Structures are given as C-alpha cells and as structure tokens.
A protein has these predicted regions:
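N-terminal "domain-start" segment that seeds a small globular fold
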Residues: 1-24, 44, 109
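Conserved helix-turn-beta segment immediately C-terminal to the redox Cys motif
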Residues: 29-30, 39, 43-67, 87-90
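Residues that form or flank phosphate/diphosphate-binding pockets in enzymes
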Residues: 44, 73-74, 105, 152
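Extracytoplasmic/secreted proteins, especially bacterial periplasmic and envelope-associated proteins
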Residues: 48-51, 77, 81, 109, ...
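Short, internal strand/loop/helix patches
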Residues: 80-128
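Thiol-/selenol-based redox modules, centered on thioredoxin-like
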Residues: 112, 116-165
C-alpha cells in the first residue's frame, strides 16, 4: 500500500554550503541521485560522475550527490571537508548535498522515498553500498536503481540520460 503520492520534487534538502535546495526546481529534468563517500574503493567514480555531468548536464539532466558515512565509516569528513575534497580531487560541479544517512533509523526522508515502495509507489531498493545510483524521471517519479559498481558511463545510464532506454 502506498502511503502517499509524494514525488521526488516534493522534497527539499540542504547543500554542502548550508543552502536550502528545493527539488521542485528540478521539474522537467532527469535526475541521478548518488550516495557518495571520500574514502571508498569506488570514490574514483566521482571522476565519471563529473564527466557525465559535463557532457549531459543541462536543462534536461542533472546529478545530485549525497555524502553518507553509512558503510564502514568511509565518509568521515564534515560538510566543508567533503566540499574541499570533491573540488580539489575531482572538480565536482554537480550539486552536492550535506552529509546524511542513507539507511537505518536515521535515514534521510529523501532516501526513505528512494528505497521504499510504500513511499515511491514503484519499488523497494535498499542501498547496498556507496555510489548506488537512483534514476528519477522529469516528473519526479522513481525509474530505476543502478548498482554501486556500475560506472557512471555505463551503457544503461547513458541510454537513459539520452532517452534511448
């Protein structure tokens, strides 16, 4: 049973810089939501995420990163340290949100929506590890989940971004 008819666009969050980020300003864009970590074997995916954003990021597509320390304490930094790491090491220019929890009792409401069918109306999809990717369509509906080990330039992701899925 679906609890509510919330869409992704009904939420707001906070950037690494402490500014409110209303997700309703993303209406009309495809969005890839990624939980990130600075000290993970998958951290180099930041490079691929940034390349994807530079190539396809526009009025039609964006990426949002959510740093989280839920898997083996691989994101120990505070928001300022995370921002500096992302800029210095990967030149990240896609929106990065404040550090949150993506699982357990402290799970952020956006991730409750992303991971629970009763919230998103489509599918249950627990977060398996850092750099799991959730795909959201232009109207704020949950589309798919892509595993952490799948690179940002995977055929599945590129085809979805280009509308060839």
């Amino acid at each position: 049973m679906i609890k509510n008819n919330k869409s992704f666009h009904d939420f707001s969050t906070t950037t690494l810089q402490g500014k409110v980020f209303e997700l309703n300003k993303l209406k009309g864009k495809k969005v890839m939501v990624v939980n990130t970590a600075s000290k993970c074997g998958l951290t180099p995916q930041y490079k691929g995420l940034q390349a994807l954003y530079e190539k396809y990021g526009s009025d039609e597509f964006t990426i949002i990163g959510f740093p989280a320390n839920d898997f083996l304490w691989q994101e120990p930094g505070n928001n300022d340290e995370i921002a500096a790491f992302c800029t210095k090491n990967y030149g990240v220019s896609f929106p990065m949100m404040q550090k949150i929890s993506v699982k357990g009792s402290g799970m952020d409401p956006i991730y409750k929506w992303l991971t629970k069918k009763e919230e998103n109306g489509v599918s249950d999809a627990s977060v398996k590890w850092n750099f799991q990717k959730f795909l959201i369509d232009e109207s704020g509906k949950w589309v798919d989940v892509i595993g952490p080990r799948d690179e940002p330039d995977s055929e599945q992701i590129i085809n979805w971004v280009k509308g060839e899925d």
